[in-house]
């Protein structure tokens, strides 16, 4: 059962002005050497009616003074047990640690709240861990004095490297600098890896400070070729990440913003870097053309393409073939759209290329839709290249029902009649004959198709169809008519085959 004093202490948020020191002491609301103590918020106390501090800070101070009564009061006000341990360690009051230590699951959890190196180390001792654990936690919570105190045990390069990497990853700059300047390391250049990975400018500048103070034994700063190679590699990484200020910092020490570096800026659409260095280096037209081709190959953004085209005054006549090849290679035709707006039309060569590379119908549909290309044109191009499967795929998408075969049949015959390209005609006629074999034609329509084959010198299809028609009424006179057409067109093979058929009649 709670006493009246306990209830008052826990829930009385505002003390009456009439309470004197004796009354406060009786209520347990008097803190020796400090004065009256009252709770004013869930997480704060009012000391001597003129000082507001957090409950946990008050708890730390009370524990450091060994004031168990005030500690108990503050804990009832929802204070954190961690601050009892911290304060007790500061004042060496191990009786409080013994009393409240059972409330602590893991003393490592307290370390983040400690700001004094001596207290930090004493708290870590309570966890009964080894020295390596202490050093790692000292890095984690930025306790450089602990590393300095135990400098004599940090002699193993491999372990020091592990600590250095941890400090870099945790971004504990004072510790990074101290380890880099003081301890022997296997790979001090690791600092640069983290600097670029985290885009951490402070680590980059520290890295260069260590490098040029001869703290990186693996890199000879007096070997100009090696140094330029390292710095240029850094410039390439910075361009990849879009870290413009990293590049400026690196250039203070050397390096070369070459085409490989600028190509990374293009690939990742870092226009600020591109714009700055194209102007600064006064790049030749040839180099800018190369960058444009890199942009096309990597599907760069419209803004990146536009920037590079603007430096070329949208004139690309020297690299038209290469542009088309780059577009065909990666399938991104954004540049074709841009150039068309500038009256540079690469639509047809690109379409021919896409057909040659046998891009999917879905892709080609996007392309012909974007540039408002008639399907007939695409089919004729595919026919010229002998891409029969592509034409079939296209027609299957356009005419989805089996009933549409008749429409396809007429459509293809009309295309053949408007084509001059011999191979293209042959490709379409092969498809027409395939369709003929699965549809039913009236006698009149069969004769029309035979005449069509003769008109276009489709000897193989004519002979194949002859077998289906030789018993039809009026076929022999029709053959004579076909012979006249073949003679007028001067188709020797067709003439010879028709004459042979007439002899057999």
From Swiss-Prot:
Record-linked InterPro entries: MGF_505
Keyword entries, A-Z: Early protein
Induction summary: Expressed in the early phase of the viral replicative cycle.
Domain of life according to the entry: Viruses
Record has Chloroplast as a keyword: no
Family affiliation: Belongs to the asfivirus MGF 505 family.
Function: Plays a role in virus cell tropism, and may be required for efficient virus replication in macrophages.
Protein name as annotated: Protein MGF 505-4R
């Amino acid at each position: 059962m709670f006493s009246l004093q306990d209830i008052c202490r826990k829930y009385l948020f505002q003390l009456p002005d009439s309470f004197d020191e004796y009354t406060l002491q009786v209520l347990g609301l008097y803190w020796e050497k400090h004065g009256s103590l009252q709770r004013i918020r869930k997480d704060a106390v009012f000391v001597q009616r003129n000082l507001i501090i957090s409950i946990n800070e008050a708890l730390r101070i009370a524990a450091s003074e060994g004031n168990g009564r005030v500690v108990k009061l503050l804990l009832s006000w929802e204070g954190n047990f961690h601050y009892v341990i911290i304060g007790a360690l500061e004042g060496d009051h191990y009786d409080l640690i013994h009393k409240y230590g059972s409330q602590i699951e893991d003393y490592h959890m307290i370390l983040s709240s400690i700001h004094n190196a001596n207290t930090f180390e004493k708290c870590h001792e309570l966890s009964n861990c080894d020295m390596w654990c202490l050093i790692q936690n000292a890095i984690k919570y930025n306790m450089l004095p602990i590393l300095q105190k135990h400098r004599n045990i940090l002699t193993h390069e491999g372990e020091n490297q592990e600590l250095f990497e941890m400090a870099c990853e945790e971004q504990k700059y004072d510790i990074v600098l101290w380890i880099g300047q003081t301890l022997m390391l296997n790979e001090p250049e690791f600092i640069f890896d983290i600097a670029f990975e985290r885009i951490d400018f402070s680590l980059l500048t520290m890295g260069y400070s260590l490098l040029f103070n001869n703290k990186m034994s693996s890199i000879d700063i007096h070997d100009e070729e090696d140094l330029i190679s390292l710095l240029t590699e850094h410039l390439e990484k910075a361009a990849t990440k879009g870290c413009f200020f990293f590049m400026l910092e690196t250039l203070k020490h050397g390096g070369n913003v070459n085409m490989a570096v600028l190509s990374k800026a293009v690939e990742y659409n870092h226009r600020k870097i591109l714009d700055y260095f194209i102007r600064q280096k006064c790049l030749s037209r040839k180099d800018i053309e190369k960058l444009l081709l890199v942009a096309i190959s990597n599907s760069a953004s419209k803004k990146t393409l536009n920037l590079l085209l603007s430096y070329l005054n949208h004139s690309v006549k020297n690299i038209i073939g290469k542009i088309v090849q780059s577009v065909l290679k990666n399938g991104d035709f954004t540049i074709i759209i841009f150039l068309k707006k500038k009256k540079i039309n690469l639509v047809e060569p690109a379409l021919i290329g896409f057909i040659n590379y046998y891009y999917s119908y879905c892709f080609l549909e996007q392309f012909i839709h974007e540039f408002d290309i008639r399907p007939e044109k695409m089919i004729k191009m595919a026919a010229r290249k002998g891409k029969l499967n592509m034409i079939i795929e296209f027609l299957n998408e356009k005419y989805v029902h089996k009933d549409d075969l008749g429409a396809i049949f007429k459509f293809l015959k009309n295309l053949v009649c408007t084509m001059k390209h011999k191979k293209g005609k042959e490709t379409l006629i092969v498809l027409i004959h395939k369709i003929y074999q699965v549809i039913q034609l009236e006698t009149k329509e069969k004769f029309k198709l035979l005449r069509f084959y003769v008109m276009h010198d489709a000897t193989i299809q004519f002979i194949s169809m002859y077998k289906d028609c030789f018993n039809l009424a009026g076929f022999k006179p029709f053959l004579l008519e076909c012979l006249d057409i073949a003679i007028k067109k001067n188709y020797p093979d067709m003439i010879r085959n028709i004459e042979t058929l007439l002899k057999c009649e």
